[in-house]
Amino acid sequence: MQLTIPQKLIDLAHAAPFPLYLVGGAVRDALAGLTCSQDWDICAPCDAERFSKLAADNGFTVNGTYKNTGTVNLSDGKHKFEFTSFRTDVYRRGEHAPEKIVFTDDIETDARRRDFKCNAVYYDLRSEKIEDPLGGVSDIENRCISTTRAADEVFSEDGLRLMRLARLSAQLGFTPDLECIFGAKFNAALIAKISAERIFAELQLILHADEKYGRKYAHYEGLKLLEGTDILNYILPELAVGKGMPQRKDFHDHDVLEHSFRACKYSDSRIRLTALLHDTGKPAVYAETGKYHGHDVAGEKIVRQILERLKAPKKTIDTAARLTLLHMYDLDGKARESKIRTFIVKNYDVYPLLLLLKQADYSGCKDDLNVCPGILKWDRIFAQMQQENVPFTLRQLAVRGNSLNFVPANQRAQILKSLLLFCACDGSRNRTDTLLREAARLSEEHQSGGKA
């Protein structure tokens, strides 16, 4: 077992008059031969105030002591640690925070309050021995996940454990046992008791599960487990309803839900969330028209509703909704070059992300990892625009707002945007004299009742 422990923590363990243990991710990862987690969780049969004083006396910075939960946050200047007293927790059904905490000196009692056996293996920092009260080492060796008690009991206590199961399984490549699966499925509705912010944070971790230990497509495995345990029905019902909805066989090998999963599977990490949600408009428009046409427009609104419900950051919401609206443009490859040039300039700020989404969408149709043909066309046009020095932003225009003193102040912003589009099809137009003439024409047209 390769476990590199900060020396100050080892020194603290030798100074303590009680055994001090490392527990959780760091021990699990070391035993599994994975890159050691930097989550330094420590515990002992000792109350928080006593431990806090001991840590401070041994050169640690104590950032918070919470005697009601038996928790101490501390740092050695390089690493952060969280200490928790041995305890057992009593929950109100499904809620993340325990309703009652009872402290104990028994390591097995402490182990049984935890979620999974693989997270309930202790490393004695003084004796350098493993303490395994529940058989977690065997689970780690066999790369499986089982609960510390009856699965129904563990999941009924804390609804967030439902998503944590999917995340850990995906990140680690560990397989949940059947009791675990059935226990999660039976309690899936309890995810509704967890705050939207926590659900979104856990979803993001699942969508980036491949980044934790470098397991390719780990995020896809996590999503499939959310589906298999019915949790998807509660956190993303607009997505889950796509299960079983067929699509044209000449374009798709998968139903709407599986296509969304596969688009996410093959997507760049920057657009995972959008790739997952980009077709959520399909079930809605199909229910109204029996067709999928217009699902991009409906999807923009639905994606916005989903992410607002999950209290995602505003920028995340706006970007995902906008990319969803744009993802069908020129799908058939028939758009004229002039139209594509204008489209690129209008959407230049999200253009790289849109190409990533288009590629993910293409790959998710028939698991084809070749470059999407439409992207080859767009790349050629974009490269030509760059060669022509087409301006893509207002800062790249040869004129500024203060150059348009002959234009009413309330028109200048719109005129500048129109000038940008004016240059889209011909970069040579980006000259001061040419743009000033065009600005004068647009202003006159606007004042005479036309639109710039």
List where the protein language model places each region.
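Catalytic cores of the polymerase beta-like nucleotidyltransferase superfamily
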Residues: 1-452
